[in-house]
């Protein structure tokens, strides 16, 4: 129901804002003379931009689906090898003590536990290309256990919110963009991103647990979380002792090495258990094509709505309003120019990435004597990019793949986690870089 309201809201709010911009242009001389408000032909042409955005986003949706089709076909093939060879079942048994408490409605020995863990691992390593297919595989497994096939189950919501909180231990993509932009130390956002994503994950977990009446302390989940926190802190501390060039190499190579090691392990176990690896791969790969086709209407609808909202200028006004309010209450506003990346990230990953890169370019053009990627605002944009996930895109893709129409409180919980990530990102950004 909430997703329905948001979908309508993107269109209606976008239309109303655009209408006000056109009216403002028609009375531009009076408004400039009396209020100091300036309207240009850009405001007059806003409806043309909005209509064009519908075609652009529809095309973008299909481009994403075509890309996903190849990736899904590949990774569902690998996952099928893992299932037939027994690797996924072994992983399920390993994580079942913790998952039994976090997902009480999932049987302890169900293979979906392994798919969920594989997805979490890929996300933590910053391997987005493999995380999505693994996540969709997990959603299909959860749908098998779901008594109401058009309504999101409790395990689905918990899984999706933890997914959208975007816990990342190695933010490979953000560091790569910073290196490409000429940052002196591309990895210096590593720790802030980890802290922000961990905060978002914890708040997301607490929020969903509140909805689902899961007692984190009584069930022992808090103990698991504390243990995981200690492991992460120790691991990060060890990495930070490395020289920066070595750290960049480790973070770049480490995640991909682990991923390929998992694939090879799947192959070895399957071969050992006398599984026809090639036939198993083909059987799993067929599911990739079928799953991707199901996603198309959900993805087109959501991305077109986001495109309308963005092209109307609403997001720009929202950022300007936030800057005005923050300045009004006396808080430092140096981070405000980076907010477009933060606000765009839950809506569109590519849009947020574009905002971040535009920020780099803007400060690079100012000839400050150092790389534009090293400006405080650029570092804040980098942390925002790495600290939250594309909530609406993820919901559209994951629920679309299994035809879930009633999302219950998924959106609310996901956005609460995103907000926690953004607030933490601002705090750690000031602590580390301001």
How would you name each of these model-derived features?
Residues 37, 117, 121, 156, ...:
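Generic signal for short, ordered secondary-structure residues
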Residues 1-70, 179-310, 327-329, 384, ...:
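Signature of multi-pass transmembrane helix bundles
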Residues 113, 150-153, 260-261, 335-336, ...:
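Short hydrophobic/aromatic segments of transmembrane alpha-helices and their interfaces
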Residues 104-107, 111, 147, 171, ...:
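Proline-rich intrinsically disordered, low-complexity coils
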Residues 130-131, 138-179, 183-213, 342, ...:
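C-terminal transmembrane helix pair
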Residues 45-144, 273-366:
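Membrane-embedded alpha-helical segments and adjacent helix-loop junctions characteristic
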């Amino acid at each position: 129901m909430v997703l329905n309201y948001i979908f309508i809201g993107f269109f209606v709010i976008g239309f109303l804002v655009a209408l006000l911009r056109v009216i403002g242009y028609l009375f531009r001389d009076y408004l400039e003379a009396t209020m100091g408000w300036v309207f240009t032909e850009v405001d007059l042409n806003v409806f043309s931009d909005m209509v064009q955005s519908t075609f652009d986003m529809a095309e973008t949706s299909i481009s994403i689906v075509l890309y996903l089709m190849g990736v899904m076909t590949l990774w569902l093939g690998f996952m099928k090898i893992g299932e037939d060879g027994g690797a996924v079942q072994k992983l399920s048994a390993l994580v079942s003590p913790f998952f039994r408490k976090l997902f009480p409605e999932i049987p302890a020995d169900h293979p979906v536990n392994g798919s969920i863990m594989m997805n979490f691992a890929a996300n933590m390593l910053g391997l987005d290309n493999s995380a999505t297919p693994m996540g969709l595989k997990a959603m299909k497994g959860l749908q098998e256990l779901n008594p109401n096939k058009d309504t999101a189950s409790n395990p689905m919501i918990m899984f999706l919110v933890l997914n959208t909180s975007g816990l990342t231990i190695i933010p490979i993509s953000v560091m790569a963009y910073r290196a490409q932009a000429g940052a002196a130390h591309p990895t210096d956002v590593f720790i802030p991103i980890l802290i922000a994503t961990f905060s978002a994950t914890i708040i997301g977990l607490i929020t969903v647990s509140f909805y689902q009446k899961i007692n984190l302390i009584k069930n022992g989940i808090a103990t698991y979380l504390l243990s995981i926190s200690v492991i992460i802190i120790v691991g990060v501390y060890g990495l930070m002792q490395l020289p920066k060039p070595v750290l960049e190499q480790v973070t770049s190579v480490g995640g991909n090495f682990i991923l390929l090691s998992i694939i090879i392990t799947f192959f070895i176990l399957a071969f050992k258990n006398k599984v026809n690896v090639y036939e198993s791969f083909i059987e799993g790969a067929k599911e990739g094509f079928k799953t991707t086709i199901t996603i198309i209407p959900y993805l087109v609808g959501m991305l077109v709505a986001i495109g309308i909202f963005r092209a109307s200028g609403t997001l720009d006004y929202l950022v300007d309003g936030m800057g005005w309010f923050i300045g009004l209450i006396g808080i430092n506003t140096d981070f405000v120019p980076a907010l477009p990346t933060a606000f765009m990230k839950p809506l569109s990953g590519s849009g947020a990435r574009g905002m971040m890169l535009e920020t780099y370019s803007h400060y690079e053009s100012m000839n400050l004597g150092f790389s534009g990627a090293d400006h405080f605002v650029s570092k804040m944009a980098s942390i925002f990019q790495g600290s939250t996930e594309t909530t609406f895109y993820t919901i559209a893709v994951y629920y679309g793949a299994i035809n879930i129409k009633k999302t219950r409180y998924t959106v609310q919980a996901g956005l609460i986690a995103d907000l926690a990530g953004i607030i933490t990102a601002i705090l750690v950004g000031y602590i580390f870089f301001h």
